[in-house]
Amino acid sequence: MKYIKRFENSLESIITTINYSNSRFYKLPKLPKTLISLDCVGNNLISLPKLPDGLENLYCSGNDLTSLPNLPDSLKKLTCNFNSITKLPKFPITLIELHFAGNGIIKFPDLPEGLEHLDCSSNKISHITKLPNSLKKLYCYKNNLTELPILPYTLEYLYCNHNNLEKLPKLPGALEYLICSNNELTSLPELPDGIQLLDCRNNNLIELPDLPDSLKKLTCDGNNLPYDDLDGYKYFKKYPEKYAAKKFNL
């Protein structure tokens, strides 16, 4: 069994960052009180030691964790992708970035109001509760979702592909990237003026909404769209060669 021994007393008072990534450790020692950032990605850990009160960044993806210890009130970034976690602890209000993709999460957790980046993809979530008003990036693909909640007006990235969605809520004006492929969508809501990328392939769409001039890439194959008459779409009529032929996957 590979593990690391406790730090010397002379080091405990000065260490702020530790990187144990891809070291095949089964166990970690007691962590220094001064620690701000811990990276233990890609080991064989089944548990973590008590986390220091001042810890701000925790990266523990790719282990065998089934749970996490209590999180310190100072934590800003948490990445625990691809473990075997089924229940998450309470999150501190300081948390800005949260990644727990590829676990066994069924119940969507309560989120801190200041959260800006959330990746909950590849879990077993069937319902998402209220999202923080500060959220900018949401990755919730490969779950069991049938609907989405009201989206915060700050949201810029939405990846909700590979679910069972039949419709989407109103899209926020800040949205730039919308990936909603491989669902059961029959229509799309009005697209925001600043959207740059739309991937809506493999749904049940029979028409597209008006496509804003800001759009740079559209992928919409695998639907029931009438491609025989692209002039029916104002966007393609306005940019018949520059976009339809070169940047759009039809």
Language model feature labels by segment:
Residues 1-12, 241-250:
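Short acidic, low-complexity intrinsically disordered linear motifs used
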Residues 6-43:
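N-terminal segments that cap or nucleate solenoid repeat domains
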Residues 18, 38-40, 58-60, 78-80, ...:
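Conserved hydrophobic beta-strand positions in leucine-rich repeat
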Residues 28-31, 48-51, 68-71, 88-91, ...:
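Canonical leucine-rich repeat
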Residues 33, 39, 44, 53, ...:
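Asp/Glu-rich intrinsically disordered low-complexity tracts
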Residues 199-247:
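Leucine-rich solenoid repeat scaffolds
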